[in-house]
Amino acid sequence: MTGSYAASFLPWIMIPVTCWLFPVVVMGLLFIYIESDAPST
């Protein structure tokens, strides 16, 4: 893999984003959805 294309930095920056940031965002949105959808008894 050579850095001859325009967005050569993209795979390097997408690895921590997809491994760390994406699960945190998904878990946060899922937590907000579950807590807002919970019946208030």
From Swiss-Prot:
It is found in: Cellular thylakoid membrane. Keywords: Membrane, Photosynthesis, Photosystem I, Thylakoid, Transmembrane, Transmembrane helix. The keyword Protease does not apply. One of its GO terms (biological process) is photosynthesis. It comes from the Bacteria. The chain crosses the membrane at residues 12-32. It is a single-pass membrane protein. GO terms for cellular component: photosystem I; plasma membrane-derived thylakoid membrane. The keyword Membrane applies. May help in the organization of the PsaL subunit. Belongs to the PsaI family. This is Photosystem I reaction center subunit VIII.
